[in-house]
C-alpha cells in the first residue's frame, strides 16, 4: 500500500483532530503537524479561567505533545511557522532555520487571529489580546509583576464578557467598553441582552456606544480614551473580534468563501484538489438556512477535523453544518442560544412569532430553584422551531435539548409533547422548555 504524507498547518483542536483521525485509519502514513507556538491541542476557551486563577495554565493543553508523538505516531513540529505553501510543498520557519516539506494532502487548520484596532497605544506594555494560551501566560505574569487595580476590557462579545468576569472575580475595578448599543448584539435579541446588561452594571462600569480613540501611558498603559471620556487602566484586554487566517490559503489559490473564511464542501475539501480546511479558518453551512456561515466554535472545529481526517484516509463522512449553539456566563448568570434569533430569522425572510417567558428550574417547594428566561422563535408557516435563547440558571440542558430538537426539525407541537424527565430535585413538572412551546402555541 502506497504511503502518503499529510501535512497539517495548525496544532489546535481541529488540526490535532485531523491528524489523530488520519493516523488511526492509516497508521502507516506520515502525518506532520506544524504549530507556530509551543502549545498543542490547546484550549483557548480556558484562557479567562486561567486568568481568574481557577485553572493552571498547563491545563490549557488537552494532551501534552508526547501523547501525539509517542502514542499516536504524529510527526509534531512546535515553534514551526509555515510561511509559504505551494502545490505539493510547504516552507517552514523552525528554530534551526527554514525547511521545505512535501505533501500529498494538505490541511489548513491554522485558526483565526484577533482583530486588533489600529489605535494609538495598542502596543503599550499592559495591553493584551486573549486568543491563544501564550496570552494567558503573558497576562498572568503581568499581574504578578505589576500593581493592577483598574482593568479595561474593550469589546462586548463572549471573550470580552468572560475576561471581564475573570477580573471582577479577582477583585479588580473593571470597565467594559463597546461601540455597539448592546452587548452580545450579534448573537442575542434585546430581551436577553437587557438582562445581561443589568447584571454587568451591578458589577462593573459598562460603557456602550463609545468608540475607543487611543490608549495612553508612558512606560506602560495608564488610561483608555474614548469619544465620551477616559478611564484609568493598569491593564487592558482587547477583545474586538477575530478573523480567519486565510493568507496562506490565498497564496495557494484556495477559494475564499463569502464569509471571508475558506470555502469547504461537506467533506471539508477546499476548491484545490487534496487540500482540506477545518476549524476556525473554515466556513460551513447553517443547518436551518442552508447559507454559508462562519461560526468559529470549538465543538464544530473538533468535528470538522474528524471529518477532514476521515475523508483524507478514505472513509467518507459528511459534515452536516452548524446551528451556532453556544453558551457563556457572567458570574452566576448563564447565557446561551441555539439556532436563529428573531433578528436573524427575519433577515432570512421567515415570517416568525416569538415568546419570552420567565420560569423556575425546580418546583417552588424544592430548594435550589433558579430563575430562567427563555425566548423561542418559530416559523409561522410550518410551526417549526427556529431558535431558542436562554439566560439565568440551569440553562445548559434546555439549550442542548433545543439544539437536538431544531436539528430534528421539531414543531412547537413536537416540543410540547416531548417526554422529558421530571423529579423535584431536577426540574418542575412543566419544564421551562415545554412551557415555552405551550406559549408559542401550535
UniProtKB/Swiss-Prot annotation:
Catalytic activity: hydrogen sulfide + NADP(+) = sulfur + NADPH; hydrogen sulfide + NAD(+) = sulfur + NADH; 2 NADPH + O2 + 2 H(+) = 2 NADP(+) + 2 H2O; 2 NADH + O2 + 2 H(+) = 2 NAD(+) + 2 H2O
Reported cofactor(s): FAD
Catalytic residues (UniProt): 45 (redox-active)
Positions annotated to bind FAD: 13-14, 35-36, 42-44, 82, 280, 298, 422
Superkingdom of origin: Archaea
Binding site for CoA: 24, 41-45, 62-63, 72, 302, 358, 430, 438
GO molecular function: CoA-disulfide reductase (NADPH) activity; flavin adenine dinucleotide binding; NADP binding; NADPH:sulfur oxidoreductase activity; protein disulfide isomerase activity
Gene3D superfamilies: FAD/NAD(P)-binding domain (3.50.50.60)
pH dependence statement: Optimum pH is 8.0 for NAD(P)H oxidase activity.
Nucleotide-binding in keyword set: no
EC number: 1.8.1.18, 1.6.3.2
Temperature dependence per UniProt: Highly thermostable.
One Pfam family in the UniProt entry: Pyr_redox_2
Record's keyword terms, sorted: FAD, Flavoprotein, NAD, NADP, Oxidoreductase, Redox-active center
Cofactor: binding details: Binds 1 FAD per subunit.
Entry similarity comment: Belongs to the class-III pyridine nucleotide-disulfide oxidoreductase family.
Function, in words: Catalyzes the CoA-dependent reduction of elemental sulfur (S(0)) to produce hydrogen sulfide. Can use both NADPH and NADH, but shows a preference for NADPH. CoA-SH may act to solubilize S(0) by forming CoA persulfides, followed by the reduction of an enzyme-S-S-CoA intermediate produced after both enzymatic and nonenzymatic evolution of H(2)S from the CoA persulfide. Also catalyzes the oxidation of NADPH as well as NADH and predominantly converts O(2) to H(2)O, with a preference for NADPH.
Quaternary structure (record): Homohexamer.
NCBIfam families listed in its UniProt record: CoA_CoA_reduc
Protein name per the record: NAD(P)H sulfur oxidoreductase (CoA-dependent)
Taxonomic placement: Archaea, Methanobacteriati, Methanobacteriota, Thermococci, Thermococcales
